[in-house]
Amino acid sequence: MQQFLSLKNLLIADSIGPVLLALTALLSATGLSAQSLYFPSSDEHWEQIDPETVGWNTALLSAALDLAGELDSSGVVILHRGRIMAERYWELENPSQRYQNFLQGRDTKDRAIEDVASAQKSVVAVLAGIAQERGLISIDDRVSKYLGTGWSRASEQQEAAITIRHLLSMNSGLAANMTYSAAAGGVWLYNTPAYHYVMRILEEVAGTDRNQLTSEWITEPLGMEYSSWTPRPWADAAIGSGFSTTARELARFGLMIQAGGRWQDQEVIADRAYLEAMLSPSQGLNPAYGFLWWINGQEFSLGAGAGARRVDGSLIPAAPDDLVAMQGALDRKLYLVPSLDLVVVRLGATGSSNDVNFNNAFWPALMAARQ
């Protein structure tokens, strides 16, 4: 804990509040994964749990899933300490071309395999932590140490100030076209093209491609057999591949984070200080953002759009303050709620309508089921 608080990015520690308290308890309890969490051996043998036995109303929980289906979800999986508490799948009617672009196939149970869009960023954040743990990088290294000069459209001097930490925190100071916008660390801007350079660094230091390193470091240990990086022929080269997976396999990833970086008895990522930093405010410009993860319970948040619009209050007001999330286009979601022992995954088409986004529609319904 002392090591974590000493990190320079946590000079804003007063804003962390319940998120840090819950996650610190979760991540420091190394016995939690061994004693309290269940890890499925395979999809064929994934235990379920009766919601009523762990404080949830079955009828109201079903109503929350009904709502998710009405909001164009293709799949929702809710885990309680690793066991499936609720799960449902839908066949989308008249899916948009955009959804069809993200649909990569189906598993043997006919469950959708989908490119999770920007939810992949949170997977890359974990890969960066593993690379640092293995001594391949330091997130405080300059990007140019690994990619040389000229990787952006900023001047050499401006570019030299940008670190991997800046890319993980979305405060590189680069505009979406990779030109200089502000000094590194001086402004927060959700910048997908800049983020993609994190993976380029990881491929460089690992000496292999993204599929191989992701398989070795994450998906193979977790049994995520349908998960891989897939090409996006419809996209610009800067975002030309996406992480594709199923709702169940994304839930496996969330369960590993819930277990503090462990899967069964295997340490996937052992650096608890990095995990705590990843799931806590990475800077003061947008306290609702960690290292490529979204964080609830903060004073305000900045949006992912080009204008980075400020919204006062929690990211998801109806959800517990300690929620952290992976979020992507078409409302791809993974929510982790330490205080409720939940991992919640949602895939599908855009679930936001009538000026109400999916988060603000789904979470009041889900929390109504809590007894």
Give residue ranges: language-model regions.
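A short, well-structured edge-of-sheet supersecondary motif
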Residues: D66-Q104, L334-L336, D341-V345
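Active-site-proximal alpha-helical segments within enzyme catalytic domains
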Residues: A194-I201, G242-W263, R332-L347
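Active-site SXXK
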Residues: G82, N101-L103, D110-I139, V198-E203, ...
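N-terminal signal peptide c-region/cleavage motif recognized by signal peptidases
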Residues: A29-T30
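Structured C-terminal helix/loop/strand segments within mature extracytoplasmic catalytic/sensor domains
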Residues: L323-Q371
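Active-site helix/loop module of the DD-peptidase/beta-lactamase fold
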Residues: D110, D115-S118, E133-L174, A206-T245
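Active-site Gly/Thr loop motif
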Residues: Y226, S280-V343
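A short, polar/charged loop-to-alpha-helix boundary motif
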Residues: E93-K109, S353-A361
